[in-house]
């Protein structure tokens, strides 16, 4: 039902400020989930099970982190047919993020630019929201560092968040690739990443012993990487036996949107313009890690064919964000059906 109404809703939402529209939509989804009205949103999406990271996904099409930073609308989002949901990024302490305006639509390019800056209510409130959700599907919890934490102490923030979210996560994503937190992408450097992942894997094992379950770790990386950087990241993932990698986050490049309104705004660009760059990183990663580290492909998926292209490049699962905002819930079913047809052929 909601899928058929979304084009009308989008016309109204796109007349609003982008962030205001985002918050309005999340509040509506959150209310639907809390009141049981989520059944009215329910999308008819076929099951297409896939096992990755030792987890069985209802279907291989998930929601990327960033849409629901505080985990406040999990049940409403779950009704839209996603095979898995990722919420966050969350930080140890609440923080306001960057000053507004900080989210911009580029409809001519079917893109968004955001410089949100990990605005969230902090990990304690995040955990309460996750615990309150009735959803029992695959739930990824995405963690980051506070803006005022020195980069040299970043590991402390990740370790703290990992400990807090671990009991409630199907998997945990380590976000080191947002361009909107100063110096965060430095953690993608070989030495920095090696030290961070060593600390996280040690903490993961201790938490697994404590809770009696091993929660997989995924690393989210940027598209703005050269061949040498991709190889170094791949080597580090293999060395530390990281369970998955998410490729990719938003890009700093503006090559595809030059001259468009808002193109010069600072922040990360997402949507169609990042599709090819994301696929290239996926291909390069897959060439290095093979099946040892599953890849979750995200970036510029607007159709079933786009989702299939991510899998052809080497991804095992895909996630939607900007395409979901532009096309709505119908995109989820389209992607699942396209992937299922490909596998049946």
Swiss-Prot record:
<dbReference type="InterPro" id="IPR001295">
    <property type="entry name" value="Dihydroorotate_DH_CS"/>
</dbReference>
<dbReference type="InterPro" id="IPR012135">
    <property type="entry name" value="Dihydroorotate_DH_1_2"/>
</dbReference>
<feature type="binding site">
    <location>
        <position position="271"/>
    </location>
    <ligand>
        <name>FMN</name>
    </ligand>
</feature>
<feature type="binding site">
    <location>
        <begin position="65"/>
        <end position="69"/>
    </location>
    <ligand>
        <name>FMN</name>
    </ligand>
</feature>
<keyword id="KW-0665">Pyrimidine biosynthesis</keyword>
<comment type="similarity">
    <text>Belongs to the dihydroorotate dehydrogenase family. Type 2 subfamily.</text>
</comment>
<feature type="binding site">
    <location>
        <position position="175"/>
    </location>
    <ligand>
        <name>FMN</name>
    </ligand>
</feature>
<dbReference type="InterPro" id="IPR013785">
    <property type="entry name" value="Aldolase_TIM"/>
</dbReference>
<dbReference type="GO" id="GO:0044205">
    <property type="term" value="P:'de novo' UMP biosynthetic process"/>
</dbReference>
<keyword id="KW-1003">Cell membrane</keyword>
<feature type="binding site">
    <location>
        <begin position="321"/>
        <end position="322"/>
    </location>
    <ligand>
        <name>FMN</name>
    </ligand>
</feature>
<keyword id="KW-0472">Membrane</keyword>
<feature type="binding site">
    <location>
        <position position="300"/>
    </location>
    <ligand>
        <name>FMN</name>
    </ligand>
</feature>
<feature type="binding site">
    <location>
        <position position="220"/>
    </location>
    <ligand>
        <name>FMN</name>
    </ligand>
</feature>
<dbReference type="InterPro" id="IPR005720">
    <property type="entry name" value="Dihydroorotate_DH_cat"/>
</dbReference>
<feature type="binding site">
    <location>
        <begin position="249"/>
        <end position="250"/>
    </location>
    <ligand>
        <name>substrate</name>
    </ligand>
</feature>
<dbReference type="InterPro" id="IPR005719">
    <property type="entry name" value="Dihydroorotate_DH_2"/>
</dbReference>
<feature type="binding site">
    <location>
        <begin position="114"/>
        <end position="118"/>
    </location>
    <ligand>
        <name>substrate</name>
    </ligand>
</feature>
<dbReference type="Pfam" id="PF01180">
    <property type="entry name" value="DHO_dh"/>
</dbReference>
<keyword id="KW-0285">Flavoprotein</keyword>
<dbReference type="GO" id="GO:0005886">
    <property type="term" value="C:plasma membrane"/>
</dbReference>
<keyword id="KW-0560">Oxidoreductase</keyword>
<feature type="active site" description="Nucleophile">
    <location>
        <position position="178"/>
    </location>
</feature>
<feature type="binding site">
    <location>
        <position position="248"/>
    </location>
    <ligand>
        <name>FMN</name>
    </ligand>
</feature>
<feature type="binding site">
    <location>
        <position position="69"/>
    </location>
    <ligand>
        <name>substrate</name>
    </ligand>
</feature>
<comment type="function">
    <text>Catalyzes the conversion of dihydroorotate to orotate with quinone as electron acceptor.</text>
</comment>
<feature type="binding site">
    <location>
        <position position="180"/>
    </location>
    <ligand>
        <name>substrate</name>
    </ligand>
</feature>
<feature type="binding site">
    <location>
        <position position="89"/>
    </location>
    <ligand>
        <name>FMN</name>
    </ligand>
</feature>
<dbReference type="GO" id="GO:0106430">
    <property type="term" value="F:dihydroorotate dehydrogenase (quinone) activity"/>
</dbReference>
<protein>
    <recommendedName>
        <fullName>Dihydroorotate dehydrogenase (quinone)</fullName>
        <ecNumber>1.3.5.2</ecNumber>
    </recommendedName>
</protein>
<dbReference type="GO" id="GO:0005737">
    <property type="term" value="C:cytoplasm"/>
</dbReference>
<comment type="pathway">
    <text>Pyrimidine metabolism; UMP biosynthesis via de novo pathway; orotate from (S)-dihydroorotate (quinone route): step 1/1.</text>
</comment>
<dbReference type="GO" id="GO:0006207">
    <property type="term" value="P:'de novo' pyrimidine nucleobase biosynthetic process"/>
</dbReference>
<dbReference type="InterPro" id="IPR050074">
    <property type="entry name" value="DHO_dehydrogenase"/>
</dbReference>
<keyword id="KW-0288">FMN</keyword>
<comment type="subunit">
    <text>Monomer.</text>
</comment>
<feature type="binding site">
    <location>
        <position position="142"/>
    </location>
    <ligand>
        <name>FMN</name>
    </ligand>
</feature>
<feature type="binding site">
    <location>
        <position position="175"/>
    </location>
    <ligand>
        <name>substrate</name>
    </ligand>
</feature>
């Amino acid at each position: 039902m909601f899928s058929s109404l979304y084009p009308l809703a989008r016309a109204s939402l796109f007349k609003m400020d982008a962030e205001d529209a985002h918050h309005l939509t999340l509040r509506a989804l959150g209310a639907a989930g809390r009141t049981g009205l989520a059944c009215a949103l329910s999308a008819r999406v076929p099951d297409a099970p896939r096992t990755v990271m030792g987890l069985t996904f209802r279907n291989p099409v998930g929601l990327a982190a960033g849409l629901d930073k505080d985990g406040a609308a999990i049940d409403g989002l779950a009704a839209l047919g996603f095979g898995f949901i990722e919420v966050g990024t969350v930080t140890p302490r609440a923080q306001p993020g960057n000053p507004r305006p900080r989210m911009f639509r580029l409809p001519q390019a079917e893109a968004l630019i955001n410089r949100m800056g990990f605005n969230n209510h902090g990990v304690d409130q995040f955990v309460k929201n996750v615990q309150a959700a009735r959803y029992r599907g695959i739930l990824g919890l995405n963690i980051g560092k506070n803006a005022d934490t020195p980069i040299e102490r970043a590991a402390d923030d990740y370790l703290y968040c990992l400990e807090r979210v671990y009991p409630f996560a199907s998997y945990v994503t380590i976000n080191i690739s947002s361009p909107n937190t100063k110096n965060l992408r430095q953690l993608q450097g070989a030495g920095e990443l090696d030290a961070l992942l060593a600390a996280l894997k040690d903490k993961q094992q201790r938490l697994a012993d404590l809770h009696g379950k091993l929660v997989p770790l995924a690393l989210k990386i940027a598209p703005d990487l050269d061949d040498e950087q991709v190889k170094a990241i791949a080597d580090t993932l293999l060395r530390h036996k990281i369970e998955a990698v998410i490729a990719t986050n938003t890009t700093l490049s503006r090559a595809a949107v030059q001259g468009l309104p808002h193109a010069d705004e600072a922040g990360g660009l997402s949507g169609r313009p990042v599709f090819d760059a994301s696929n290239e990183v996926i291909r390069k990663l897959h060439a290095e890690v093979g099946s040892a580290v599953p890849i979750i492909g995200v970036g510029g998926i607007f159709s079933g064919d786009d989702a299939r292209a991510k899998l052809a490049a080497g991804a095992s699962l895909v996630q939607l964000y900007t395409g979901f905002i532009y096309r709505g819930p119908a995109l989820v079913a389209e992607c699942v059906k396209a992937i299922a047809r490909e596998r049946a052929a």
